[in-house]
Amino acid sequence: MKIRPFGVEQWMNEYETRCTYNLAETCVESLTVRQLLDLTGHTDLLQDLLPMKLTYGEIEGSDRLRSAVAALYAEQSPQNVLITHGAIGANHLIYLSLVEPGDRVVAIVPSYQQHYSIPESIGAEVRLVHLREENNWQPDLDELADAIGGRAKVVSLTNPNNPTGSLVDASTLAQISQLCDAAGAYLLCDEVYRGIDQQGPGTTASVA
């Protein structure tokens, strides 16, 4: 297995902590733990953690955490939640679990590099569907259907998109889901930036 160098991470590792002005940053300024607790109103959280034993823990993640994650979605239960080491770990696990050499993986790009480099390293046939400025960075569903071709194993997208920030609405997500269902393909929707476009209560519609 050989994975292409992760260009953006290598660049960020070399330069992001050494510059005066970082115009490429996608994250907000970091908070201290105290600021975060004050912001959420859970100032007694530390006292809740101190009696906790540092055991091996549940393989799938604690019931409390899985229930909290499930509550972020309209129709999900803790049984459908698996705790991983971030979205990177979750994506990696999905590709290693589902993709075999020769399988077709369709990646909507630009996107996080692992969504095409990992399947490529496994030996998958990777098809890229490009978002275009003239289409407001929205996926062309006809082009997507052609790439799926009735035989894709996995279709991946990031929503909100990384790096353009474009957002696929609930109606288009439903159409993409239908294309995947028709082909018997898994839809991997990386929603790590879900909520950054939030206005008012609630968060961005999820494909889940």
Regions found by a protein language model. Give the residues of each.
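N-terminal small-domain helix-loop-helix segment of the aminotransferase-like
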Residues: K2-G86, L93
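Generic structural signal for small/hydrophobic residues in well-ordered secondary structure
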Residues: L23-T26, V69, V81, V105, ...
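Short acidic capping loops at alpha-helix termini that bridge into adjacent secondary structure
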Residues: S77-V81, P101-R104, R151
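Conserved PLP-anchoring active-site segment centered on the Schiff-base-forming lysine
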Residues: S97-P119
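A short helix->loop->beta-strand "cap" motif at the edges of active sites that frequently abuts
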Residues: D103, A124, A182-A185
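Aromatic/hydrophobic pocket-lining residues that form π-stacking "cages" and hydrophobic walls in ligand
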Residues: H115, I176, V207
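A short helix-loop-beta submotif of the ANL/AMP-binding
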Residues: E120-V126
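Active-site phosphate-binding strand-loop segment of PLP-dependent enzymes
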Residues: E133-T203
